Regions:
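Conserved G1/Walker A P-loop phosphate-binding module
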Residues: 1-96
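C-terminal effector modules of nucleic-acid-centric enzymes and ribosome-associated factors
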Residues: 12, 19-22, 155-158, 306-311
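Residue-level signature of catalytic and energy-coupling elements of molecular machines
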Residues: 27, 33, 52, 95, ...
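Active-site glycine-centered loops adjacent to acidic/histidine catalytic or metal-binding residues
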Residues: 27, 151, 186
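Alpha-helical scaffold elements adjacent to nucleotide-binding pockets in ATP/GTP-utilizing enzyme cores
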Residues: 33-37, 58-60, 105, 112, ...
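Conserved Switch II/interswitch segment of TRAFAC-class P-loop GTPases
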Residues: 88-92, 96-102, 111-136, 140-162
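Conserved catalytic-core segments of large NTP-driven translation/proteostasis enzymes
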Residues: 170-311
Length: 311
C-alpha cells in the first residue's frame, strides 16, 4: 500500500480509519486475539483481571507491517523505527465485553466501528452462545463488514470442527449475514494470525480523509485520572475518550459537549445543558499529538471537571 508522505507521517502516530470492533461471546477469545495482535492485554482494570473478562471497552492500536509476510509492531518489538518503514496499516481495535449483562456497553461502541472481527469458539455449540447472536445482529444492523475467526480449533477433533462450522454457516445464512471471510484460528498457539492480518488489510482498508468537514467527535467513555486522596490543588481535568468522525481537531480548539448536564426542571420536564471546553491535550496510545484527523481512538484532555468524567 502506497501512502503520500503527509499521510505516512500521520499514520505512524495516529490510526487512520477504520476502527475495528472485536465482537463475540464471553470466553471465545476476543481479548486473546487483541493481545496476540498488539502485545497488550486490553483488560487493564483490576476487576477485569481478577474475573478474567472484559467489562469495559478495551482500546488498542494495531500497526500492521509487510515484508515477505504480514506481522505487527508490538510492545517488545526491537528497532521499532526501522520496522516502521514496512508499515502498511495502522488502526484501532475496540475490544467489547461479551457477557450478556454488558450488551449495552457493546452497543455504545458500535457507531465508532467501520468493521468487526467476530470471534467464535469451536469448543461449544452455538446454542450456548446467546451473546454471539446479539453481537452478530448488532453488526448487521450497523451494516458492518465482518471478518469471522473460528477459534479454539485445537480443542476439538476434525469431526466436531466440521460440525461446528456447519452450525455456524447455517446460523449466518439464517441471519442473512455474509462475512468477508472465515479464518480458522487458534490464538492460544498463534495459529492463523498471519492470515488474519492479511484479511484485515484487504477488507478494512484506509479510507479517504476530508479534514475540511465540520468537527464531529463521538465519545463513548470518559475518565477521571486522579487517584484517591489527591490534593485538591493538584487535581487534573477530565479526559474524554472516543473517535473523531469528521473534520480536524487540534490542541486549543473549543468544543461543545452534548447533551452535557441533564436532569428535570420544576415541571418534571427533561432538560439538558451542553457545556463548552477547550482541548488541552490529545493522546493516541503512547503518542501525544497536536492535531488529529478522522480515525482511531483518542483521549482528549479537557478543562472539564473530573467529577463529570467519572466512569
Amino acid at each position: 500500500m502506497n501512502f503520500t508522505n503527509e499521510i505516512y507521517d500521520i499514520i505512524k502516530k495516529q490510526p487512520v480509519n477504520p476502527n475495528i470492533g472485536m465482537l463475540g461471546s464471553v470466553g471465545d477469545g476476543k481479548s486473546k486475539c487483541v493481545q496476540i495482535l498488539t502485545g497488550f492485554n486490553p483488560c487493564t482494570h483490576s476487576d477485569e483481571q481478577i474475573r478474567n473478562m472484559t467489562i469495559k471497552p478495551g482500546y488498542r492500536n494495531l500497526m500492521i507491517c509487510h515484508k515477505n509476510k504480514y506481522y505487527t509492531i508490538k510492545k517488545k518489538t526491537k528497532n521499532k523505527e526501522k520496522e516502521m518503514e514496512n508499515l502498511v496499516h495502522h488502526l484501532s481495535i475496540i475490544d467489547c465485553p461479551g457477557h450478556q449483562e454488558l450488551i449495552f456497553i457493546m452497543l455504545s461502541s458500535i457507531l465508532l466501528m467501520k468493521g468487526a472481527i467476530v470471534v467464535v469458539s469451536a469448543a461449544e455449540p452455538l446454542n450456548q452462545k446467546p451473546q454471539l447472536i446479539q453481537h452478530l445482529a448488532a453488526a448487521k444492523l450497523a451494516n458492518l463488514p465482518i471478518i469471522l475467526c473460528h477459534n479454539k480449533l485445537d480443542l476439538v477433533d476434525k469431526k466436531i470442527a466440521l460440525k461446528r462450522k456447519k452450525e455456524l454457516d447455517e446460523k449466518l445464512e439464517e441471519m442473512g449475514i455474509v462475512p468477508k471471510v472465515i479464518v480458522p484460528t487458534c490464538f492460544s498457539r498463534g495459529y492463523g494470525v498471519e492470515n488474519l492480518l492479511e484479511q484485515i488489510v484487504k477488507h478494512f482498508p484506509q479510507t479517504t480523509v476530508n479534514d475540511d468537514d465540520d468537527i464531529l467527535f463521538m465519545s463513548n467513555r470518559s475518565f477521571d485520572i486522579n487517584k484517591p486522596g489527591t490534593n485538591a490543588l493538584e487535581l487534573k481535568p477530565g479526559i474524554i475518550g472516543g473517535s473523531l468522525l469528521t473534520g480536524k481537531l487540534s490542541i486549543g480548539d473549543e468544543i461543545i459537549v452534548t447533551p452535557g448536564i441533564f436532569g428535570k426542571n420544576n415541571k418534571g420536564e427533561l432538560y439538558y445543558d451542553p457545556f463548552h471546553t477547550k482541548i488541552d491535550s490529545i493522546q493516541s496510545d503512547k503518542y501525544s499529538l497536536r492535531s488529529i484527523i478522522p480515525g482511531g481512538l483518542m483521549g482528549l484532555g479537557t478543562s472539564v471537571s473530573p467529577a463529570l468524567c467519572k466512569n
